[in-house]
């Protein structure tokens, strides 16, 4: 944006130095300069709003991950598409505070939701007797954040995980 502004000013200076003061060209340059200044202001406002939301959402959890539900339910098979269309992923808490933030969403809705547990997970929160493939090959978290083996065909609360890396 600054390059556009500087180019416009350079062009304006060239017109003035050549004595070529065409009103329409000067008005066009002034309009461009004004438009760039408005864009810079709008960008600053948008960045401030985004940072405010980010800080508010991550304040309570201390996490750069945010867990959000659309209040719908889905089987595991459709969950990745739902989350990816929203710009997120299936939840995969890697730390206790992330699992707590995820569980807070489940508690508010009083429903369980699917999550993904990686093979190299440093953090797990399995309930007693789990994992147990007899219950299913998917994983769900209950309203307390405990993980249970589950059928992938259960309709559970849609919760997606979003990363804030700024």
From Swiss-Prot:
Residues 1-19 form the signal peptide. Glycans are attached at residue 122. GO terms for cellular component: extracellular region. Residues 46-161 form the C-type lectin domain. N-glycosylated. The glycosidic chain may contain superficial sialic acid residues. The keyword Manganese does not apply. Keywords: Disulfide bond, Glycoprotein, Lectin, Phospholipase A2 inhibitor, Secreted, Signal. Expressed by the liver. InterPro entries: C-type_lectin-like, C-type_lectin-like/link_sf, C-type_lectin_CS, CTDL_fold. Coiled coil: none annotated. GO terms for molecular function: carbohydrate binding; phospholipase A2 inhibitor activity. Disulfide bonds join 83-160, 138-152. It is found in: Secreted. It comes from the Eukaryota. Belongs to the alpha-type phospholipase A2 inhibitor family. Homomer composed of 20-25-kDa subunits that form oligomers of 180 kDa. Selectively inhibits the toxic properties of myotoxin-II from the same venom (AC P81165). Does not inhibit PLA2, anti-coagulant and lethal activities of the basic myotoxin I from the same venom (AC P0DQP6), nor the different crotoxin forms (heterodimer or subunit B alone). Does not block the enzymatic activity of crude acidic PLA2 fractions from the same venom. This is Phospholipase A2 inhibitor CgMIP-II.
